[in-house]
Amino acid sequence: MKVLTHWTLAFVTVIIVTLFHYNDNYVVETARLKSFDLLQQSDELVHSSDIGIVTIDEKALEKYGQWPWKRSVLAGIIWELRQADVGIIVLPILFSEYDRLDGDQELLNAIADNGVVIGQNGSFTANKNGVPRGVAKINDPLPFLFEWEGMLGPIPEFGANADGVGVLNTVPEIDGVVRRLPLLMRIGDDIYPSIAIETIRVAVGEPSYQVKSNAGGIDKMRVPGYPIIQTDSNARIWLRWNKTFDTISASEINRFHELAGKTVILGVTADGLTNIIASPKGGQYNYMPSAVSLQNILDGDTISRPYWAFLAELSTTFSVGFLICLLYTSDAADEEDSVDLGGRRI
């Protein structure tokens, strides 16, 4: 009967642990994400041949003055990049207010019909001056998209004339680490693409993009003329953080030609002027999710989690737990069957 008790206790324990895993609570999810981080940290670095970074760093501040610069300075950098024959120019910067230094017209001239994509941000306030983008839908994707109360967009002149306006928001995991990035978000019935999707759309010259959903969520999306992008049910992709990029200071105009033919992202890196985000590989500048997600899509190497992965995890949890309990109960049975003779157990 005691052996039966051991078996019963062991079996109940395995069932409880398996149900604990099935509920996918904080502990289980954190363990899963940390194991994902270990894989990312061992991933071989790959240098991008498609994307270059121009940084607003300390050297640039010494040359152009304190940030934010007069927008005519940014306009000058854009024209220098265009003169260097770069590809799409991405400014993951909010231009939600007019320039108090009266440089808006010069920047408008630089971004209008010039292959420039600028940023906007989802907001918890109900402002709706963002710039949505037309989308062809197969079934209704809205119930599955991350939703914001409002969208903090650029000033109307910039929003109407820039070739692209994309969302900059990240959605960190439960432990605050950025591992996935939504390619689409919503406000009400309006859908807003990420800055990576907008960059690809502008690069191929398409006015819109396509998204397909089913009863389980978002299935895939596509910019016409470009391969299908597999996402999770909430239109997110897992970021593969193994990318490195050619990086040049905004002060080094004479080196811009080194980025010829590449998509160029203008990112703020000067101390005190940018937020650092947590990634599986440590702290990153806040323009990096845009750069990494764009490179992942271009390479077609977005990380995917198979639909059967959760069932495989449950099966493994049950099998390993059952094996451990089997060994434990066997030892317990041996202990019960042993006999003490003369101080010795046989």
Where are these regions (language model features)?
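Short gly/ser/thr-rich secondary-structure transition/capping motifs
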Residues: 36-37, 247-250
